[in-house]
Curated annotation (Swiss-Prot):
This is Probable glutathione peroxidase 5. It comes from Arabidopsis thaliana (Mouse-ear cress). One of its GO terms (biological process) is embryo development ending in seed dormancy. The lineage of its organism: Eukaryota, Viridiplantae, Streptophyta, Embryophyta, Tracheophyta. Gene3D superfamilies: Glutaredoxin (3.40.30.10). SUPFAM superfamilies: Thioredoxin-like. The active site is at C46. Ubiquitous. One of its GO terms (molecular function) is glutathione peroxidase activity.
């Protein structure tokens, strides 16, 4: 784990972070207070792209009116499987998979230059192999209060976590 574990993250909630959208505009994540979030590092040229994007879109459409939002963060750290610009990644998700949820600016999810929001997520829910994200489409379920509920690896399909999403949506703030 090393020095960059939870001790280097002072934020207590995902709502304390500001990120950039695919065009570079700042987005304060406090706008998602009271919503259940599924934060995912996405890639357009991965073997898991088709199934994950399709199911993320399905989940978003099914639960968005109940306060569920997918936050997609393109990442090129795994075999350069998101080689284009942030805008190209956004266009890909929206055109090919009809994504209506936010697709943010490309980020690093591991290492010294990892996005602060990802340092937070990993510090709150390390996997059994440590906090490092192993591959594209790692998913973090975040409750209405901005706390990380669970972390799901690449091979966990988005549709398989519907019960967890429903449980989080049913919780009071």
């Amino acid at each position: 784990m090393g020095a960059s574990s939870s001790s280097s993250v002072s934020e207590k909630s995902i709502h304390q972070f500001t990120v950039k959208d695919s065009s570079g505009k700042e987005v304060d994540l406090s706008v998602y207070q009271g919503k259940v979030l599924l934060v995912v590092n996405v890639a357009s040229k991965c073997g898991f792209t088709e199934s994950n994007y399709t199911q993320l879109t399905e989940l978003y459409r099914k639960y968005k009116d109940q306060g569920f939002v997918v936050l997609a963060f393109p990442c090129n750290q795994f075999l350069s499987q998101e080689p284009g610009t942030s805008e190209e990644a956004h266009q890909f998700a929206c055109t090919r998979f009809k994504a209506e949820y936010p697709v943010f600016q490309k980020v690093r999810v591991n290492g010294q230059n990892a996005a602060p929001v990802y340092k937070f997520l990993k510090s709150k829910k390390p996997s059994f192999l440590g906090s490092r994200i192993k591959w594209n489409f790692t998913k973090f379920l975040v409750g209405k209060d901005g706390q990380v509920i669970d972390r799901y690896g690449t091979t966990v399909s988005p549709l398989s976590i519907q019960k967890d999403i429903e449980k989080a949506l049913a919780q009071e703030l």
